[in-house]
Design a protein with these regions (language model features):
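Positively charged, low-complexity intrinsically disordered leader regions
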Residues: 1-27
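Short beta-strand segments enriched in small/hydrophobic residues
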Residues: 31-39
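Glycine-rich phosphate/diphosphate-binding loop of Rossmann-like nucleotide-binding domains
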Residues: 38-52, 134-223, 227, 232, ...
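Short beta-strand elements in bilobed, periplasmic/extracellular small-molecule ligand-binding domains
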Residues: 55-69, 183-185
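Short, well-structured alpha-helical segments in soluble
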Residues: 75-87
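Anion-binding alpha/beta catalytic cores of soluble intermediary-metabolism enzymes, centered on
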Residues: 93-154
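Rossmann-fold NAD(P)-binding glycine/threonine-rich loop
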Residues: 104-121, 125, 228-283
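A charged, well-structured terminal subsegment
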Residues: 147-155, 275-276, 280-285
Length: 287
């Protein structure tokens, strides 16, 4: 089975649009997401454009602030602090990567926890690992939604995650644990990686290396979730971290690239923005 993130995200965005349509009468306004883009990296520009289009579909107000890559770290942090204090703003996202002279860690930590729609703030990360209410990172959240929509049984399964980044690898491992999978995190220093991956019933790959996972690394019937977005060095076309053509016949479930995890990441960003909005509404009522 091929899981189309494009189709699933379209259904979920339609449901969110119906939900948001009732907000002006109920709450007086719709959620407001502010996206900050520093520089003109083509990939970042494309991602930001996709987020703006999704916001329009769902009915969320989207403001994109574009700044040159010459902006100083202090100027960017000051801008974020102003948005933190702006009651009309429910979600703040700074598109990564940032220029080398700006600390991504400082930027992420400066965004107010309650407006951190990416789920990267240290307090949100801590809450995730403590099983407390928090904003879940978009890509891991989307991965779990995709598997559940495809009817994948996660409980009790052997899950292998290749990649240990704070953005995907570590949080998706935690979400799989929360679904009662038995999780192994593999990485560049893992000894005999093919032996590890062949033992997986669920394989999540997020390492950013085109077609890294080959057919001999996957057992028959494995659920394969490909998070990578790369350029095929031979064709120049988009491809994932797994050799899709070779692995698709062996996999029980697989996600394509493009059209797999990517659309679900943006879909979950919309969901997180709505959640941040509703939490802020709830807090304002109880204050």
């Amino acid at each position: 089975m091929i899981i189309s993130g494009k189709e699933l995200s379209a259904r979920l965005k339609a449901e969110m649009a119906a939900q948001v349509a009732a907000f002006p009468e109920k709450y007086g306004r719709v959620p407001h997401l502010v996206v900050i883009l520093v520089g003109e990296d083509p990939g970042s520009v494309s991602y930001v454009t996709g987020k703006a289009k999704a916001s329009e579909v769902v009915g969320i107000k989207n403001t994109t602030i574009r700044k040159p890559d010459s902006i100083t770290e202090d100027e960017l942090l000051c801008m974020i602090r102003e948005l933190n204090e702006d009651d009309s703003v429910d979600g703040i996202l700074v598109q990564l990567p940032l220029p080398k002279h700006i600390s991504e860690d400082k930027v992420i930590a400066t965004i107010a926890k309650e407006k951190d729609v990416d789920g990267f703030h240290p307090l949100n990360v801590a809450a995730l690992w403590q099983k407390q209410e928090c904003v879940l990172p978009c890509t891991p959240k989307g991965i779990i939604k995709m598997m559940k929509a495809a009817g994948v049984e996660i409980k009790g399964k052997r899950a292998v995650v290749i990649g240990r980044s704070n953005i995907v690898g570590l949080p998706v491992s935690k979400l799989l644990l929360d679904e009662n999978a038995t999780v192994t995190i593999a990485h560049s220093r893992t000894v005999n990686l093919p032996e590890v991956t062949r033992n997986a019933e669920i394989l999540v790959v997020a390492i950013g290396r085109p077609k890294f996972v080959t057919a001999d690394m996957v057992s028959e019937g494995t659920v394969v979730i490909d998070v990578g977005v790369n350029r095929d060095p031979e064709t120049g076309k988009l491809c994932g971290d797994v050799d899709y053509a070779a692995i698709e016949p062996k996999a029980s479930v697989i996600t394509p690239v493009p059209g797999g995890v990517g659309p679900m990441t943006i879909c979950c960003l919309m969901e997180n923005t709505i959640e941040c909005f509703l939490r802020r509404i709830r807090w304002s009522v109880t204050d």
